[in-house]
């Protein structure tokens, strides 16, 4: 009995050690993100729970009218939610809110303040500098300047086409704004990046750990950063008579999130073909069609492949051939970590298993992320973990 008890104690210690053995992931610094909006005749206040907060952290909510002294509006610290409905507020007045975390009955440092104007709408509005013929499309957020507050990065689209549709498109445009409406920059991907939902997957994340998010996306000859710097050869036009881009170089670029200036550009992995100008038959053999549909289905994500640092993963294809390329941003350079190609020897079961989306998760509990790619999963080391064989579904 004594021996069994010692075994159980040892097992308990081992389990505790294993559960805490994984290194802390490199995370972005964020403030409380306090925001308030009208909610009927009340004011809805919300804030952010941080990963560094104690599990038993509660919050007090403070409100000030105009320039008066702030008063606490909650009776007891709020510990079950990260929002509060202020039923005693008057939406015709301007209020300033902030919260203070409470741990073991003691108030800690107050959050940043948020001012709600009188008669405000129940949403935040950011005026856009939308070019003629364009409209706002996909958006992402990231802390571009390191102040703990998210900025908004918007993909503006003009004429666009699905991969299955022929036709000339307008160049994809990206703009960044602060939450107060301040315009930061514009990037124009140019005529050699086709516009459409499947073509440009842009990632916004702090890839190098400097506290500021970068922007990464596929670029082409003639892409222009916010400072007017041209990527590749702007004189080239690789579009064919049907509007598809089946030849020419392909690039992967990472941009400074605050300025929109290109940091580094490298060859995109994997290119549509080993040749710069492949024939339609050569493309069909590799991708299943030769006119630019299946080969230009792109996905992307950010994953903690080593369990600590974020890596950029750019993906191509899911109907037939599938390629995932993982990159790290080190010293201002994109460094290839690994490439998974379903055409490689032993990877045939992983072909044609992709979908129109992907997920990132530590599915095997080793503290490192895997890429769940439709009906198959790629391990953190770039090797196939498993494939269900169900196919595109």
Residue ranges of each PLM-predicted region?
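Short beta-strand elements bearing conserved aromatic residues within extracellular beta-rich modules
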Residues: 58-61
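Short, Lys/Arg-enriched N-terminal segments with co-localized hydrophobic residues
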Residues: 1-3
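Amphipathic alpha-helical interaction segments
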Residues: 20, 55-56
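Beta-propeller-forming repeat regions
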Residues: 27-31, 40, 49-54, 64, ...
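Beta-strand-rich domain onsets/edges
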Residues: 36-42
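Hydrophobic h-region of N-terminal signal peptides that target proteins for export
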Residues: 14-23
């Amino acid at each position: 009995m004594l021996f069994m008890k010692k075994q159980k104690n040892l097992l308990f210690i081992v389990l505790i050690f294993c559960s805490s053995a994984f290194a802390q992931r490199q995370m972005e610094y964020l403030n409380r993100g306090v925001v308030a909006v009208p909610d009927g005749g009340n004011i809805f206040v919300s804030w952010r729970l941080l990963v560094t907060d104690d599990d038993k952290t509660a919050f007090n909510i403070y409100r000030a009218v105009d320039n008066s002294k702030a008063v606490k509006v909650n009776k007891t610290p709020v510990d079950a939610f990260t929002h509060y409905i202020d039923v005693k507020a008057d939406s015709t007045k301007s209020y300033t809110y902030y919260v203070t975390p409470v741990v073991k009955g003691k108030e800690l440092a107050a959050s940043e303040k948020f001012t709600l104007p009188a008669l405000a709408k129940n949403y935040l509005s950011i005026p856009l500098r939308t070019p003629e013929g364009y409209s706002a499309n996909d958006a992402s957020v990231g802390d571009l300047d390191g102040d703990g507050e998210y900025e908004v990065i918007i993909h503006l689209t003009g004429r666009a086409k699905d991969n299955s549709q022929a036709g000339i498109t307008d160049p994809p445009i990206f703009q960044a704004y602060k939450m107060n409406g301040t315009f930061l920059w514009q990037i124009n991907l140019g005529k050699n990046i086709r516009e459409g939902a499947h073509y440009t997957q842009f990632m916004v994340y702090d890839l190098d750990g400097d506290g500021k998010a970068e922007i990464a996306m596929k670029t082409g000859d003639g892409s222009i950063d916010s400072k007017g710097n041209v990527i590749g050869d702007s004189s080239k036009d690789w579009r064919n008579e049907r509007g598809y881009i089946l030849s020419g170089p392909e690039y992967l670029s990472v941009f400074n999130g605050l300025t929109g200036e290109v940091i580094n550009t490298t060859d995109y992995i994997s290119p549509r073909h080993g040749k710069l100008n492949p024939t339609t038959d050569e493309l069909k053999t590799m991708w299943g069609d030769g006119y630019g549909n299946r080969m230009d289905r792109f996905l992307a994500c950010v994953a903690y492949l080593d369990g600590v640092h974020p890596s950029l993963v750019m993906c191509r294809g899911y109907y037939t051939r599938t390629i995932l390329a993982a990159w790290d941003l080190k010293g201002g350079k994109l460094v290839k970590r690994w490439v998974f190609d379903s055409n490689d020897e032993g990877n045939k079961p992983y072909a044609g298993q992709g979908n129109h989306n992907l997920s990132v998760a530590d599915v095997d509990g080793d503290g490192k992320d895997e890429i769940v790619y439709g009906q198959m999963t790629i391990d953190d080391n770039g090797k196939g973990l498993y494939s269900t064989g169900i196919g595109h579904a």
